[in-house]
């Protein structure tokens, strides 16, 4: 998604018209910024403007007698009838994300570009009172660490409820540019915070739960909001070493494309029925993603089963980037034609609106080519009830949502729950945590809160945030609970100045407990900004080491914040650092969540969804190397292929209590299955044979400790003989969260394992089930294991269409 430069003020449709075509020649980019280096597109006001929105009047307006207002007709027929009324100029004026509408038809201007990554953004928030804020949830990477798919769905559902309430007040669109389901392949990536982490199966489940939560249970008849799966595909670098995302050409094998970079989009299209997909800035194997019919037609529509009339939007200015910097087209008009013909329906930008007339004049496009995309967009709007005249809940359950629904859903406190469930306990020496109120009564306890995150407010939200109702810093949270707080920033995120060290050490000296809150934030990891290093930045480690030396017997707890990981090996190995937690970007209630985890009002059960690599990893090979498998200087990427030793592994996470994990009565320690017998089973109710359940991995989980706690599980598979080498170290095949396991209680964990979990991807991109021996193991400790022997002949279970 493109950087919006600054938050724009609302404009009327007339003002938008003034921003449009007359300025095209004056504003046309003739400076030719080197977008091979510059990662922020120079977006024009017409693109980035937020506008007041209104519904077409199908009762009394000019369209009332047209098919578009006939609620008994199909959404596609209604949309096609509307677009047929447009003149060519009117058609072109509605090909951008900011559609100008058609005033003579009573069709209002419409803004496609709304954001909903972890709450409403690019909404027309009021200055005060109603519609002044919306719930700001934790960033997806922290939410995913909770391993709670119900939570993901619930968050998305709340976002869409609040979005529809804002929409009914003319303050938000019916389409959202979310979720970001790219995988967090390399730790330097600045936008990893927006993603579900480095594992593609996690990303696929996140995509399904988020999209179905946003779109509602019946998207074909009553679409709640249209989700957009982004960024398709192979997008996970911003500006590493001046390699701009706008001009990157990512070389990706068919094997890695099929196995890692696209399965989450396959699930989004086939299973979640996502209504929109965003093509990415980058090129893949020489072709810009928004000009690649292989991605947009062969894969997305023909193979992945994208909904018939779903639309593809470019990332913002990506259509222009086909010309500059990719040089794939000789002019902006040619770039517009390439994108349209490849399958990019809507241009988030102005290239279509300013240059499609030239494309037609050159004979590169016809009106029909352009119409197709606009019809697809308006089909989605019809499904969302944009043209419905009857606003009763019986016919459209979303048109009556209002500010009271925003208040109600925020009061559920799900943002807080998501943060407490996602926070990961990395280290807890001698079980120093939790710092219970019994041992540390707030009225008699002084807490030193030190570090650049100790008084964080806006930092808690990460990026793509709107107006939150409140932002609770760690400092405010501890003060609210009655603790005496000695606050000292000590140092900044990237500071090398030691001028604040003395105050920090003084604050620690007179405290009973020392908490250092630091790490990274959006000054180092953001859109258009990758990290150069994955070490702790600035002199934060120096300050922590001084605090550790001065702590004596006092607990020293370090909060490692931010979306990406930093190398905390020195803290892991320092016996004076009592505990270490990863808190991500925990949202509006982040301070409360961190405090309550530390004090034991909530117990941690999150697990890392990224690998914490040693700092040297970022220097071993180029971040633009997209090959997952180890080769040359590349030691392998993600936990699946990494051949080195992680500081903290993917899936690491500690509890305050102890659990005994054992085979359940239904567990068979060795299973022999015939491939042909499995694949011959009927599966008409499944979209793919890969979804067919093969077995249930079961285990007994007994809480043997002293505290009630949730339990989180990851089930991994590995093999050393099924299919050709090289073999991955392991891969995730399932996961779950058991809530509130009481002391002494035993619960059964049951994780279904599907055919696709036993498939490996060959060099052509085909998913193949090979005969051989697999091992399934529970979590990193591997205390419960099942041996699975597959016999018979290898079979392709998913055929990958190669690019000719």
Curated annotation (Swiss-Prot):
Nucleotide-binding in keyword set: no
Induction cue: Expression is under the control of the xylanolytic transcriptional activator xlnR and the repressor creA.
Enzyme class per UniProt: hydrolase
Signal sequence annotation: 1-26
Reaction(s) the record says it catalyses: Hydrolysis of (1->4)-beta-D-xylans, to remove successive D-xylose residues from the non-reducing termini
GO MF annotations, alphabetized: alpha-L-arabinofuranosidase activity; xylan 1,4-beta-xylosidase activity
Activity vs pH: Optimum pH is 3.2.
CC terms in the record's Gene Ontology section: extracellular region
Described purpose of this protein according to its UniProt entry: Xylan 1,4-beta-xylosidase involved in the hydrolysis of xylan, a major structural heterogeneous polysaccharide found in plant biomass representing the second most abundant polysaccharide in the biosphere, after cellulose.
UniProt xrefs under PANTHER family: EXO-1,4-BETA-XYLOSIDASE XLND, SUGAR HYDROLASE-RELATED
Name under which the protein is recorded: Exo-1,4-beta-xylosidase xlnD
Taxonomic classification: Eukaryota, Fungi, Dikarya, Ascomycota, Pezizomycotina
Gene label: xlnD
């Amino acid at each position: 998604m493109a950087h919006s430069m600054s938050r724009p003020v609302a404009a009327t449709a007339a003002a938008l018209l003034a921003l449009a075509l007359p300025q095209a020649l004056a504003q046309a980019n003739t400076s030719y910024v080197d977008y091979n280096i510059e990662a922020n597109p120079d977006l024009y006001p017409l693109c980035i403007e937020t506008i007041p929105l209104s519904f077409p009047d199908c009762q009394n307006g000019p369209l009332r007698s047209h098919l578009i207002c006939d609620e008994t007709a199909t959404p596609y027929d209604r949309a096609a009838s509307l677009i047929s009324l447009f003149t060519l100029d009117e058609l072109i004026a509605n090909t951008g994300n900011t559609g100008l509408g058609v005033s003579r038809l009573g069709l209002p201007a419409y803004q496609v570009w709304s954001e909903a990554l972890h709450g409403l953004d690019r909404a027309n928030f009021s200055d005060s009172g109603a519609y002044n804020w919306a719930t700001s949830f934790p960033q997806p990477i922290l939410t995913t660490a909770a391993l709670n798919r119900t939570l993901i769905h619930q968050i998305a559902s709340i976002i869409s409820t609040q979005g529809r309430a804002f929409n009914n007040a003319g303050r938000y669109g019916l389409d959202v540019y979310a979720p970001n389901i790219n995988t967090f392949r390399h730790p330097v990536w600045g936008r990893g915070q927006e993603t579900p982490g480095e594992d593609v199966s996690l990303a696929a489940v996140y995509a399904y739960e988020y999209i179905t939560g946003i779109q509602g249970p019946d998207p074909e008849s009553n679409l709640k909001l249209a989700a957009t799966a982004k960024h398709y595909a192979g997008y996970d670098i911003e500006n590493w070493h001046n390699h701009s995302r706008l001009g990157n050409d990512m070389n990706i094998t068919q094997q890695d494309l099929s196995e890692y970079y696209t399965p989450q989009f396959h699930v989004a299209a086939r299973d979640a029925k996502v209504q929109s997909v965003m093509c990415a800035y980058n090129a893949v194997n020489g072709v810009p993603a928004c000009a690649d019919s292989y991605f947009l037609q062969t894969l997305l529509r023909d193979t992945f089963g994208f909904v018939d009339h779903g639309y593809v939007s470019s990332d913002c200015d990506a259509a222009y980037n086909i010309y500059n910097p990719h040089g794939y087209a000789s002019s902006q008009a040619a770039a517009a034609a390439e994108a349209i013909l490849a399958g990019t329906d809507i241009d988030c930008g102005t290239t279509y609106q300013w240059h499609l007339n030239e494309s037609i004049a050159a004979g590169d496009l016809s009106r029909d080519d352009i119409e197709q995309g606009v019809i697809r967009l308006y089909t989605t709007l019809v499904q969302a009830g944009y043209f419905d005249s009857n606003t009763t809940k019986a016919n459209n359950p979303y048109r009556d949502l209002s500010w009271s629904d925003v208040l109600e859903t925020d009061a559920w406190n799900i943002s807080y729950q998501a943060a407490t469930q996602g926070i990961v306990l990395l280290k807890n020496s001698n079980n120093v945590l939790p710092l219970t109120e019994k041992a540390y009564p707030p009225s008699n306890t002084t807490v030193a809160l030190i570090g650049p995150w100790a008084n964080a407010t806006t930092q808690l939200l990460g990026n793509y945030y709107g107006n939150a109702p409140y932002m609770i810093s760690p400092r405010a949270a501890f003060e609210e609970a009655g603790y005496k707080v000695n606050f000292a920033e000590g140092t900044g995120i990237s500071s090398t100045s030691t001028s604040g060290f003395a105050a920090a050490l003084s604050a620690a000296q007179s405290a009973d407990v020392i908490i250092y809150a630091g790490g990274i934030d959006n000054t180092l990891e953001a859109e258009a900004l990758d990290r150069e290093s994955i070490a702790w930045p600035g002199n934060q480690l120096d300050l922590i080491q001084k605090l550790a030396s001065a702590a004596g017997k006092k607990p020293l707890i370090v909060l490692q914040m931010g979306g990406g990981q930093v190398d905390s090996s020195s803290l892991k190995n320092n016996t004076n650092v009592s505990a270490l937690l990863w808190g991500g970007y925990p949202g509006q209630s982040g301070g409360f969540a961190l405090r309550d985890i530390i004090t034991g009002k909530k117990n941690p059960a999150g697990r890392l969804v990224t690998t914490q690599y040693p700092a040297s990893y970022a220097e071993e090979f180029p971040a633009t190397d997209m090959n997952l498998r180890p080769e040359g200087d590349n030691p392998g990427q993600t936990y699946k292929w990494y051949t080195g030793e992680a500081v903290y592994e993917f899936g690491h996470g500690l509890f305050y209590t102890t659990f005994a994990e054992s085979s359940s009565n239904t567990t068979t320690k060795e299973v022999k299955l015939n491939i042909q017998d499995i694949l011959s089973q009927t599966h008409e109710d499944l979209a793919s044979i890969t979804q067919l359940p093969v077995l249930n991995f079961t285990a007994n989980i007994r809480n043997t400790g002293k505290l009630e706690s949730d339990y989180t599980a990851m089930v991994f598979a590995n093999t050393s003989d099924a299919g050709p080498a090289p073999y991955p170290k392991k891969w995730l095949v399932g996961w779950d969260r058991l809530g509130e396991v009481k002391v002494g209680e035993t619960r059964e964990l049951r994780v279904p394992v599907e055919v696709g979990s036993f498939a490996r991807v060959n060099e052509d991109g085909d998913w193949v089930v090979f005969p051989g021996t697999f091992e399934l193991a529970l979590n990193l400790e591997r205390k419960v294991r099942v041996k699975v022997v597959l016999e018979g002949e290898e079979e392709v279970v998913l055929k990958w269409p190669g690019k000719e």
